[in-house]
Amino acid sequence: MKMDWLKGLMRLRAGTIIAASAGVCLAVCLLALLGVFIVQSASTMTARAVSGIEPDWQVQVVGTTDAESADVAIHSTVKTKSLYKVDYADVSSLSSTIDGTTQTTGVGKAVGLDEGYANNNPRQFRLLSGSLDGVLLAQQTASNLHARPGDTVTIARLGQAAIDVKVDGIIEVSNADQFFQIIASTPQTALNAPPDNIIFLPAPQWEAAFASQLDSMPQTSQRQLHVSFDHSVLPGDPTQAFVTATEMANSLAAKLAGGGVTANNLAARLDGVRQDSLFSKVLFLFLGTPGAIVAILLTMLIVLSGSDRRKRDIALLQMRGASRSEILSMSGIEALLVGAIGAVTGVALAAVLAPIFVSSAMNTAEYYWFAAAGLSGIFASLVVFLIPSWLALRNTALENTVQPRTLAYLAPTWQIFGIDILLLALAWFIFWQVSSTGYQVVAAPEGVATATVDYKAYAAPAFLWAGSALLLMRLFSLFMRHGRNVLEQVLHPIAAVFSKTVSASLSRESGRVTKGVVMVALAMSFAVSTAIFNTTYENQAKVDATLTNGADVTITGTTANPASPLLDTILKTVGVANAEPMQHRYAYVGNDLQDLYGINPSTISAATSMSNAYFGNNDAAATLTSLKNSPDGVLVSDETVGDFQLKEGGVINLRLQFASDHAYHIVPFKFVGIAREFPTAPKDSFLIVNAAYVAAKTGLPGSEIVLIKSSVEPPTLAASLHDITKNMPGLVISDISEAVHRLGSSLVAVDLHSLTALELAFALPLAAGAVGLVFALGLAERRRSFAILQAIGATPRQLGAFLWSEALIVYVAGTAAGLAIGWLLAWMLTKLMTQVFDPPPDVMVIPWSYIAILCLTGLIAVCIAVLFQLRKTSVSLSTAMRTI
C-alpha cells in the first residue's frame, strides 16, 4: 500500500514534490554554506590573530634559574622559531650634549638585545634613521635628547658611575606596551604604559654595564627570553587554539618549577578573538537564517496550497479504514521523499558553490555543518507535511470532504492574545536595554583591546522581524475586510468598471491575499536588510582601516626627516587624488606627554575621512570649522578633559619643543572641542591643533606625515611612491591594505564580501519565488472561481482585471512592507553594533542599485505568473468546467 502511495505521488504530484523539494534545497544549501563561512571565518580570525604576535611568550627568569636551563625547558615544550635573550635595567636618566646644550631625561630603561633581534622583528622595531646594529634610541627619547646617529648619550646607572655610548640608530618601538609589560604570576587586567625614555644596547654591552645590577638589585632589572614558535600546532577554532596555547604555557611552567614566569601573549590575543569568533557565528547565522526560514515557508506554502486535496485524500483513506498511524506514515513518506531530495540536492549544490565563495579546502567541521543542514531540511519537511495531516485527522471523513463555510471572521489565537504586539515590545525593550549599555570595549594603553558582545542583543532584530510580519498580517487583513471602498479606488485604474466586483472578491479572499503579502514582505525584508547591513559593514570596515593607517596611503617620517618636503612630488604622482601634510609631534599637558597632530582644518578631509564619530559633538564639519576659526585652538581627548578639568573656551598651556634650542617651552592654546578618534592617533589621549600655529611658535614648519587619497589601488600607488622615497632615510610608506585593526580588530576584520555575495544571490530567487509563487498558487486555488466566471460569459479582459488587480495588491503591498521592515532591521542591527565599529557609522549605506534590481526581479516574476495564468484562461469552456 505504501509503495503504491509512493508511486502515485511520483506519477500525479511530481510538480508539487519538485517545487517543495526546491524550497528545502535552498534552505539546506544556504545553511550548509553558512556553516562553511562560520568555520572559515574562525580559522581566518585565528590566523590573523597569531600572525601579528611577536613574541608568543615572554619568559622572565626568576630565582636561581639561569637562562640556559629555561632555554632547554622551552625547546622541550614547543618547536621554537626564534628565541632571544632580552635584559631590562632601570636607569636614573639619559642625557646628551648637542651644540653646547645639555638635555637630560627622567628615569628610563636600558634594554639589552641579543644579536639579530631588532633586524628579525620588523613589526616590533621600525628603523627611522641610522642602523639597527648597535645602540638604538627610541624615537621620543631621541627627540627629547636632540640625538641623532653618531651622537653620544650618557646613561646614569643606579648606584654606579655613568657611562657614555654612541648612538647607531633611531627606532620606533611599535608594540612598546607589550614589550615592557610587567610579568607577574597572576594575570594582569591591563598592560602598563611603557617607559618614556628607552635605550637599547647590544647584549655584550649591556652585560658589561648592568650585570652587577642584575645580581645586586633584581627589583630594578630583569632577564627575559622572548620566544616565537610554530603555530601549525594550533587548531583553527580560536577557542580550541586558546586552550592549546594555555596548555603549552602550563606545561612550560611545570618544567620551570617556579624558576620562570611567562607572559602568554599568544593566549592573551586568542582570548579576545574567541569572543569575537562566537560573535561572528551569531552574526552569520542571524544574517543567513532568515533566508532559510523564508525558503521553508515557501515550501510550507506549496504544501498548504493543496490542503483541500490532501484533506480529501485523508478522507478517502479514512473511509477505507486506514488507521491514524497508517495515514500519518503515508504523509511521512511524502515528507521524507521531499526532504531527502531537498537535502541531497541542497548539500550537493553547497559543495559545488563552496569553492566559489571560499578559498581554502573543506575540513571536518564543515562536513558536520553539511550533515546538520541536510538533517535540518529533512526535519523541516516532516514538520511541514505531518502537522497539517495530524490536524486533518482530528476531523471525520465527512468534515475533511466538505469545505467549511465561515459566516463571520474568526481572529486567530495569536491576534487575540496580541503576540505581534508582545514580540515588538520585547524587541524594543531588548534593543533599549542593550543599546543603553552597548558593546563595552575595554582598551589598554595605545589601543590594545579585547571586545565582548552581549549576544542577547540579537533577539531584538529576531523579535522585530517576527513581530512585524504578524503585525502586517493583522493590519492588512483588517484593511482587506473593512477597506473595500479604498481598495475599489486603488484598483479602479486597472479594473475600471469591474473595480467594485474585484475588490469585493479580494475582500472575501482576505486571508489568502494577506498571507501572500506577508510572505512577499518576509522575502523582501530578508534581501533588503542583508543588503543594507552588509554594505554598511563593509564600508565601515574600510573606515576603520583608514583610521588605523591614516589614509589610503600614508608616508610617515620624523621631525628630523619629515615627509612634507615631498608633497609637490607626491601630488604629481599618477594615482594620487589628493594629499595633505600632517604634523606629528609630542606635547606635555602638565607632566603627561601626549601625541600632538597639526592639521589644516580646511583641507584635511580631502585626503582622509573625517567621520562625525571622531568628535565629541558628532559633527565633524562644525568641529573643524571651530578649529579653523581659532588659530590657537586645540581639540583634546575625553580623558584629558576629565584629568585636567578643562572647560571649553578656556586656556590650556602646552609645552612644545622649539627649533631654536630643542627645549620644551610653554605655548598657550584655547580648548575648542573634543576629539574621540583621529587618523593614526592612539586611543587614550592626543591633541589636534592648527599646523600653521605650531609651525609659527616652534620654528619647525615641516610635517612628519603625508596623508594620500588614492585614485588607484592603494598597494599599486604605494609601490610607485617607494621610488620617490627610497633615498629619504626614515620615511615609511604604508597602505590601507596593510592596516591592522587595533581596536575590535577581529570583529570588523571579518570579511563579509563573499557572504554578502552569497546571501544576495539567494535573496533574489527567494524574493522572486515568493512574489511569483505566492501569486501563482493563489490563482491555482481559485481555478474553480475562474471556471465559473468563464461559464457565465466573462471575457479575457474581465478575467485579466481580477488577475492584475490581485497581482498589484500582493506585489506592491508586500514589496513596500518588505522594504520598510528590511530597513528597520538593518537600522536596528547597525545601532546594536555601534560600539563594535571604530568609529561607528554616521549613516547606513543603502545599495540602491541592488534594491532596484530586487524590486524589478519581483515585478518580472509576478508578471510572468499573471501572463501564464491568462494563457491558461484561454482554454475551452469544457476544459475549464472540468476543473470545477
Residue ranges and their predicted role:
Residues M1-A295, S305, A351, S360, ...:
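Membrane transport/envelope proteins' first extracytoplasmic loop
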Residues K2-M3, K7, I18, S325-S329, ...:
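Alpha-helical membrane-protein architecture signal
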Residues L12-S41, S277-A315, L336-T345, I416-I430, ...:
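Hydrophobic alpha-helical transmembrane segments of multi-pass inner-membrane transport and secretion
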Residues V39, G342, G346, A350-V358, ...:
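Juxtamembrane/transmembrane-helix interface segments of polytopic membrane transporters
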Residues I53-D66, T437-S626, L635-D638, D751:
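Juxtamembrane segments of multi-pass membrane proteins
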Residues S280-L283, S331, A335-A340, V358-I387, ...:
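Conserved transmembrane alpha-helices of multi-pass membrane proteins
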Residues L393-P412, K872-I884:
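Short cytosolic juxtamembrane segments of multi-pass membrane proteins
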